[in-house]
Amino acid sequence: MPIPASPLHPPLPSLLLYLLLELAGVTHVFHVQQTEMSQTVSTGESIILSCSVPNTLPNGPVLWFKGTGPNRKLIYNFKQGNFPRVKEIGDTTKPGNTDFSTRIREISLADAGTYYCVKFIKGRAIKEYQSGRGTQVFVTEQNPRPPKNRPAGRAGSRAHHDAHTCLSALPERNSTNYFVQPCCCLRLLGLTGLLSK
């Protein structure tokens, strides 16, 4: 009686095909698919990194990394670990699953970089089989801070501070309270002529 295929026991034909391709040196038949080459996101938002991995290979984990080489940073492991800002999109426990996409929330400027979805194969040791082409993430600051250009000298600094305070306190133009401001603020901002109109 044949043994039914499962993620732990792939179908015999696909295992034989994999072994034949390995022996022949053909390793680029299988592709880890990352659909987006680049994405732009603002700080504080979330981003989805897409990854599709065919289920025709022998068992082995899929991991997400930021960067390449020996200094690459592990971003997500679908099997174990604590990754508070990262969550998987697909159900990787479901037999036949091919979706290894992830969502990263609360993006910061430090999250800019290139992210890789990487397939490993279990053997005597876990061996990296193939990586996706990578998704480059650009991060823009949502509310950039204004530059601190204060005028020189004590009086100038005080005037700049008062002007900033007055400007930030002024309501919208369509507000009925637009001109109800302390006289010093109006004088400082050169708006005293508005009172006579």
Swiss-Prot record:
The record lists glycosylation at 174
Signal peptide, first to last residue: 1-29
Domain named Ig-like V-type is located at 31-135
What PROSITE patterns does this protein map onto? Answer: IG_LIKE
Q: Where is this gene product found?
A: Secreted
Tell me where on the tree of life, at the top rank, the source sits.
Answer: Eukaryota
Q: Which UniProt keywords apply?
A: Disulfide bond, Glycoprotein, Immunoglobulin domain, Secreted, Signal
Spell out the Pfam families in the cross-references. Answer: V-set
GO CC annotation: what is one? extracellular region
Protein's gene: SIRPD
Name this protein carries in UniProt: Signal-regulatory protein delta
In its UniProt entry, the species of origin is given as Homo sapiens (Human)
Question: What broad class describes the main subcellular location of this protein?
Answer: secreted
Question: Between which residues do disulfide bridges form?
Answer: 51-117
- Region Disordered: what ranges? 139-158
